[in-house]
Design a protein with these regions (language model features):
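Conserved HGGG/HGGXW glycine-rich cap/lid loop of the alpha/beta-hydrolase fold
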Residues: 23-82
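Alpha/beta-hydrolase active-site loop signature
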Residues: 50, 74-78, 139, 273-278
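Active-site loop/oxyanion-hole signature of alpha/beta-hydrolase fold enzymes
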Residues: 70, 74-110, 285-293
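Conserved hydrolase catalytic core segment
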Residues: 106-143
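Hydrophobic, aromatic-rich cap/lid helix
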Residues: 191-228
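Short beta-strand/loop motif that positions the catalytic acidic residue
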Residues: 236, 242-244
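Conserved alpha/beta-hydrolase "acid-adjacent" motif
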Residues: 249-255
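Catalytic active-site module of serine/aspartate enzymes centered on a nucleophile-bearing elbow/loop
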Residues: 265-302
Length: 302
């Protein structure tokens, strides 16, 4: 492992937390790289779409005084740069998490968005997980946007990165309200301008949008695959903490309501004034401090 102090050189914020890096080999031979912070009982933080280990820098730092925090880069990004294969399923991500749990001995997991889906599925199948906290898994209880997947695949295959990003944000209902009134061609132009600035000035330790965009289709493939999985989660024996923000899209609250009814060992917290990005760094729209406080209490309970 190499010790490292990270500095985000973007003008919006400076994010510094000391960490070391390591890697594990997953069942299919894929190398999964991760960051490690702090000392204490192990926790793994699983990222969602359009994010990498850097997005959890502040959250990991706020937990590192009590826990050893492991933050893997999921397949196809950052320290785990081997691209997804065409035979992808959520089981691949579960196997990646299993390999990290086996190496580190960690028994607690936090997952955000699609990372929350991975964490739920892992809690169902991996006895090593004793506690899992999940932030707004996109189960789309009232209907999965299946039409978005072939469109995403086509746009990415054609190199239309900006169009793919807009398709993904609209399908996930993650864009600002103004997205619903701005014409598509203008949204694409604005996104291209942002990407051009990023290409010119760099993105610090954050992965650029251009690098993350190809992974979107696999996150949506996971969402489609997990449709109808709700009832299976009744068999989860691990303790589960459901987390969400009061300003998140309404469908995510519906999904949490449904999960709360089926999970046998469940608690729930809603953060007033926070949204889906709450666990990310502050320069990415997050407010990780209250999330860290909730996780610390949950994972420290006997």
């Amino acid at each position: 492992m190499k010790p490292k102090t990270s500095v985000n050189n973007q003008s919006t914020a400076t994010v510094r937390e000391p960490y070391t890096t390591g890697s594990v080999t997953s069942q299919d031979g894929t190398t999964i790289g991760y960051r490690q912070y702090g000392h204490g009982p192990g926790i793994v933080l699983v990222q969602g779409a359009m994010g990498s280990a850097q997005n959890f820098m502040q959250l990991a730092g706020r937990l590192s005084d009590t826990f050893t925090v492991y933050v893997p880069d999921r397949r196809g990004r950052g320290l785990s740069d081997l691209p997804y294969s065409k035979d992808y399923s959520i089981q691949k991500d579960v196997e990646d998490l299993d390999a990290l749990l086996a190496k580190t001995g960690a028994r607690s997991v936090f997952g955000l968005s699609s990372g929350a889906l991975i964490s739920l599925q892992a809690a169902l199948t991996l006895p090593a997980i004793h506690k899992v906290a999940i932030f707004e898994p996109p189960l789309f209880i009232n209907g999965v946007p299946t039409a978005v997947l072939p469109r995403l695949e086509k746009e990415i295959a054609q190199g239309k990165v900006a169009a793919a990003l807009i398709t993904g944000m609209k399908a996930a209902q993650m864009g600002p309200p103004i997205f619903n009134v701005i014409p598509g061609f203008l949204l694409e132009l604005l996104t291209k301008m942002v990407m051009a600035q990023e290409d010119k000035k760099g993105s610090g330790e954050y992965l650029p949008m251009r690098a993350l965009a190809p992974t979107l289709q696999y996150d949506f493939q996971m969402v489609v695959e997990m449709s109808g999985a709700l009832e299976s989660f009744r068999a989860i024996n691990a303790e589960v903490l459901l987390l969400g923000g009061s300003k998140s899209p309404a469908f995510l609250k519906v999904d949490l309501d449904a999960l709360e009814k089926v999970l046998p060992h469940v608690k729930r917290i809603e953060f007033p004034g926070l949204n889906h990005a709450a666990s990310w760094n502050t320069d990415r729209g997050g407010r990780p401090q209250p999330v860290a406080q909730a996780l610390r209490r949950f994972f420290a309970e006997l």
